[in-house]
Regions:
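Membrane-interface amphipathic segments in extracytoplasmic regions
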Residues: 1-386
Length: 387
């Protein structure tokens, strides 16, 4: 790349970066400290993002992203990679943390399949799909199984040196390159994420559960599917030789995982070939009528206004006490809640004033009545005396 091309590329990266972080005040703590939760879909990253936002939005700007398609959607700019955005922020002097999560292959495939089951795999509403038989869903899932949830960002995408194995004692990987910190977690250790991230980020992180498929409309079918699914024996061989499973799990953990699925094996099946799967993908996209854009699926959407920040603090304190979080931080809802509370306060004050005035009038009427009765009594006495 010659000098002119490099300058143009740098301008493109800057433009994309400004669209992501342009709303932040410069030279503030959250402007200078960035966390990219840069993971594949369906590995537990939504809960991680909401947890960090609730715990540390006052210290970090948190970005949740899966791939360059999402980056283009957010910025409108093509041909810029997420790695280039990460490197650019390091180049301009920011402290950068990049977090990825590993999830076991079968569970990740299941979750990814059900995430797109309505708009993509069956092109039907979740309400209707929820009435499908497990057999019907299983047949479709098995057709696409080998093509779902492939790859690993930490190993395949980040372009960093990879150690010989995952640290099964610390339960995380941390690679530092200048002012970029690359962190790898495992979903199976989510109960330790708070402790791990609190140490790395030097601030208290409380983990909250968020966006579980079990809680969606198709949650009933999803739970039933997970309980009843039998793994075709030819797919068991694929899982047994999965290089990511072998890297992130210890020998004992691998044996436990494979033993779990050995007890749930069934006859081999035929999947779509790669050309057949590509045809399947294109056909689904052409016929798609249901929107697959998710909105408001975080507990915390990251708004930094005074109202949302106050609600975030309340939720953080509840989470610290172990209270299950069911409420969300949605800016419009927070504003409406503030307005409602102000109206209630105003009504309370008005009612107090009205009651006070009512009591005054009552007292006044009582005094007038007493005075009138006294005058009447005196007049009667005088009248009797005259007689």
């Amino acid at each position: 790349m010659d000098t002119e091309d490099f300058k143009n590329k740098l301008l493109q990266i800057k433009e994309a970066n400004d669209k992501i972080f342009g709303s932040l005040l410069k030279d503030t703590e959250i402007y200078n400290n960035i966390i990219f939760v840069y993971t594949p879909p369906k590995v537990g990253s939504t809960s991680l993002v909401s947890s960090i936002r609730i715990s540390a939005s006052h210290k970090f700007s948190i970005i949740h992203i899966h791939d360059e398609i999402m980056l283009t959607f957010f910025t409108g700019i093509k041909y810029i990679s997420i790695n280039e955005i990460i490197q650019y922020n390091s180049y301009i002097g920011k402290n950068v943390f990049v977090i990825d999560v590993y999830r076991t292959p079968i569970e990740r495939k299941m979750s990814e399949f059900f995430e797109k089951i309505s708009p993509y795999h069956f092109n039907n509403s979740e309400e209707n799909i929820n009435n499908y038989s497990v057999k019907r869903v299983t047949e479709r899932f098995n057709k696409v199984f080998p093509h779902l949830a492939l790859g690993d960002h930490y190993i395949d995408v980040y372009n960093i040196p990879i150690p010989e194995s995952f640290d099964n004692i610390k339960k995380f990987l941390l690679y530092k390159n200048s002012n970029i910190n690359y962190i790898k977690l495992r979903l199976k250790d989510s109960d330790k994420w708070g402790e791990i991230l609190s140490e790395i980020l030097c601030t208290e992180i409380i983990i909250v559960s968020d966006y579980e498929t079990n809680n969606k409309i198709i949650g009933g079918l999803y739970s039933k599917f997970k309980n009843e699914y039998k793994l075709p024996s030819n797919y068991f061989e694929i899982i047994k030789n999965d290089k990511y499973l072998q890297f992130y799990y210890s020998d004992e953990e691998i044996n436990d995982y494979l033993s779990l699925w050995t007890a749930k094996l069934t006859e081999p099946v035929l999947s779509y070939t790669k050309p057949e799967y590509l045809f399947y993908v294109n056909l689904n996209l052409e016929n798609q009528i249901y929107n697959d854009i998710q909105s408001e699926h975080y507990i915390d959407n990251g708004c930094l206004c005074k109202g949302c920040s106050s609600k975030r603090k309340d939720i953080f304190e509840k989470a610290k006490k172990g209270i299950i979080i069911k409420e969300k931080i949605n800016h419009i809802e927070v504003v409406n809640e503030i307005i409602d509370n102000k109206n209630k306060l105003i009504n309370k004050i008005v009612n107090k004033i009205n009651q006070k005035n009512k009591n005054k009038n009552k007292l006044k009427n009582t005094l007038i009545t007493n005075s009138s009765n006294k005058i009447k009594s005196n007049l009667m006495t005088s009248f009797i005396g005259l007689k």
